[in-house]
Amino acid sequence: MRGLLIILIKFYKKFISPVLPKSCRFYPTCSTYALEAIERFGAFEGGILAIKRILRCHPFNPGGYDPVPTKEEFLELKLKRRKNK
């Protein structure tokens, strides 16, 4: 599944993205973020991070620098969420 998602994102970046107007409000772009997240965390957790990022990419969000979290940062976020439940 991970490999398939990576192939689809690379296809999008190479063939679809160049013909669309630049609209991503973030750096790295949402497709680059998704690729890095899936490579780092796998299809499920990386996919969730990618979806959350894409949902934040809209005209009412100022955007800016938003890198994929490190494994340590991601683990801290997961632990905080579990404590708050």
UniProtKB/Swiss-Prot annotation:
Main subcellular localisation: membrane
Compartments where found: Cell inner membrane
Protein's membrane topology: Peripheral membrane protein
Any one of the GO CC terms: plasma membrane
InterPro entries: Membr_insert_effic_factor_YidD (IPR002696)
Cell inner membrane in keyword set: yes
Keywords linked to the UniProt accession: Cell inner membrane, Cell membrane, Membrane
Function: Could be involved in insertion of integral membrane proteins into the membrane.
Family statement: Belongs to the UPF0161 family.
NCBIfam families: membrane protein insertion efficiency factor YidD
Stated name of the protein: Putative membrane protein insertion efficiency factor
Lineage of origin: Bacteria, Pseudomonadati, Dictyoglomota, Dictyoglomia, Dictyoglomales
